Regions:
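Juxta-kinase regulatory segment immediately upstream of eukaryotic protein kinase catalytic domains
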Residues: 1-43
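Residue-level preference for alpha-helix termini and adjacent loops
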Residues: 3, 10-11, 113, 132, ...
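Conserved ATP-binding subdomain of kinase catalytic cores across diverse folds
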Residues: 28-139
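Proteins with a high burden of low-complexity, intrinsically disordered sequence enriched in S/T/G/P/A and R
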Residues: 47, 147-148
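AlphaC helix of the protein kinase catalytic domain
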Residues: 138-147
Length: 148
């Protein structure tokens, strides 16, 4: 992935957003996991180890989505490794397919920042920040309501 700057071990930010993230205080893993500015996108069926926030930046002006993964059950991690045939963080399970689709010209949210930390063989925590696709809506907003 081009145009990313490593600002800490395992923590990368797109070069266009480095100053903006520093102004927001998003310049360390601890800061990313403590960040609460923006709109909390919690929902009932979201796994307990996932947290999502939508926030905006001014320079460049953009709407961003922060997905954080922490305290991931070991069984979930092992299943991901088996399915992907390699040790992979939960964040990378989001990042890698999106980047492959982008290479084929399919419009996916642009990755702005990402990071992962390991504790021994298992993932400690990871995150990904993506940019909202202009004029897009989430699938949940377009699906019929299930009235069971």
């Amino acid at each position: 992935m081009d145009n990313f700057i490593k600002i800490n071990p395992g923590f990368f930010i797109h070069c266009d957003f480095v100053d903006s993230f520093k102004n927001l205080g998003l310049d360390s893993f601890d800061a990313v996991f403590a960040f609460e500015k923006g709109k909390n996108l919690a929902k009932a069926n979201l796994a307990s180890f996932r947290r999502r926030i939508m926030f905006e930046t001014e320079n460049p002006k953009s709407a961003l989505f922060l997905k954080r993964y922490q305290d991931i059950p070991k069984i979930t991690q092992i299943k991901n490794w088996i399915n992907r045939k390699k040790r992979i963080s939960v964040m990378a399970c989001d990042l890698e397919p999106a980047e492959i689709l982008r290479r084929y010209g399919i419009d996916t949210p642009r990755t702005i920042a990402f990071g992962q930390q390991w504790k021994g063989v298992f993932e400690k925590r990871s995150f990904i920040i993506t940019e909202k696709i202009p004029d897009s809506l989430s699938l949940e907003q377009n699906l019929p309501i299930d009235k069971k």
